[in-house]
Amino acid sequence: MKQAWQQYLQIIQQVVKPALGCTEPIAAAYAAAVAARQLGCKPVRLEVVVSDNLYKNSMGVYVPGTGKIGLAIAAAAGAIGGNAEAGLEVLAAITPAQVAEAQELIDAGQVQVSRTSAPEFIYCRVRLLGLDAEGTEHSAEVTLCGGHTRIVEQRCNDEVTFTAEQGQGGATGAICDGVDISIAAIHEFATQVEFEQIRFILQASELNGKLSDEGMNNPYGLEIGRTMQQNIQAGLIGEDVMNRIVMRTAAASDARMGGASLPAMSNFGSGNQGIAATIPVVVIAERFGASEEQLARALIMSHLGAIYIKSHYPPLSAFCGNTVTSAAAAMAMVYLAGGSFEQSCHAIQNVLSDSAGMVCDGAKASCAMKVSTSSGAAVRGFLMALNSHGVSGQGIVAGNVEQTIRNVGQMVKDGMSATDSTIIDIMSA
């Protein structure tokens, strides 16, 4: 196998993984669970310090298994009943009794959450205080930086017990640094690599498909998927391929943001973006009668394409990543429909022309609306591309897909930092 292909597999396996709940509050739960494991006694106080962007993405989203919103309950639940070994599924086995105990800490004023200027968009430090049987106070502290589970330092009783070496478990945003990767290389890899090497990606279809079913069958969030289904049944809209994709994708996001106790297969630290990279591709695979192997290749194309595009700008920025994720999904949809590589590039260009610039104003139930908007753009871009229509040389969309991707990165890094600060100020007012 080519060295670059081995790197692609490593990248996918590093950042396409199951996650239970919105990954920003879950990062706090994970840090708290690791700290609790180290503490060795019952925690009686928590201090949580996070970056502005992690705070933004935790303000309005339900924490699975708790029925509650926010960083305080996420961290407290992680400290009381989290499983540090489970990573982003840290709260999978949380019990009602443990949630009640976590809430008691909050009600007693023993969970403090604050923001700080941080070196990375993803930053979380959790410090626990506890008392042993003799009444002696102990402390444990865990710091995450650059990734939702990337521990850079641990302390026990104020003594450093672990420090990540430089480059160890590198920050998520740098994951493609030094890797020979491009849209053309991704397309070649996805279509030519041995099927057995990528069979694992089919778990994305299974996990995110179950979330979609959950959102269709039960009331979560804004019920966008269920509302579309009701409108189809009422004859107000038809169940064509676009509406089915939007409905199924939004339903999965409804369930995720509404606190469903089911994991999503995430992408680049985002469950919604994992959903956006998966469900549209699965629906098109069903429409064209694709084989299991063809679906796996399309999912690899979609997920790795999304990772590559998103590596051009910081995670948790002011830019909603569902746009570029849906662009990668559109590329994969073209493949499933028998289109050419050139048409796949058209699809990416079309989607980025359609919806690039959508802002992120925090994780919340209405993220499902942005997911539905992006998935609709993916279908439009895909259908235009199948007819060999592609946007070129207009606005931020350049004459070739690689330059367009670089332009998006520049727009986010250089043009949207003030937007990000303004959004956080508005939300915190």
Curated annotation (Swiss-Prot):
Record GO terms (molecular function): L-cysteine desulfhydrase activity
A Pfam family the protein falls into: SDH_alpha
GO biological process, any: L-cysteine catabolic process to pyruvate
InterPro entries: Ser_deHydtase-like_asu, UPF0597
Segments crossing the lipid bilayer: none
Ranges in coiled-coil conformation: none
Classification via PANTHER family: UPF0597 PROTEIN YHAM (PTHR30501:SF2)
Family: Belongs to the UPF0597 family.
Protein name: UPF0597 protein AHA_1619
